[in-house]
């Protein structure tokens, strides 16, 4: 996911929530 947050914004947001 890292480096592809633009293509996986939904997934990226989930990871940010985890942090």
UniProtKB/Swiss-Prot annotation:
UniProt PTM comment: N-glycosylated.
Activity regulation, per record: Its proteolytic activity is inhibited by PMSF and TPCK.
EC code: 3.4.21.-
Temperature-related properties: Optimum temperature is between 20 and 40 degrees Celsius.
Location of the Peptidase S1 domain: 1-19
Keyword line: Blood coagulation cascade activating toxin, Glycoprotein, Hemostasis impairing toxin, Hydrolase, Protease, Secreted, Serine protease, Toxin
Main subcellular localisation: secreted
GO biological process per UniProt: proteolysis
Tissue spec. comment: Expressed by the venom gland.
Any one Gene Ontology molecular-function term assigned to this protein's record: toxin activity
GO CC terms of this entry: extracellular region
pH dependence, entry free text: Optimum pH is 8.
Places the protein is found: Secreted
Its job: Thrombin-like snake venom serine protease that cleaves alpha-chain of fibrinogen (FGA) releasing fibrinopeptide A. Has high clotting activity.
Assigned protein family: Belongs to the peptidase S1 family. Snake venom subfamily.
Subunit text: Monomer.
Name the record gives this protein: Thrombin-like enzyme calobin-2
Species of provenance: Gloydius ussuriensis
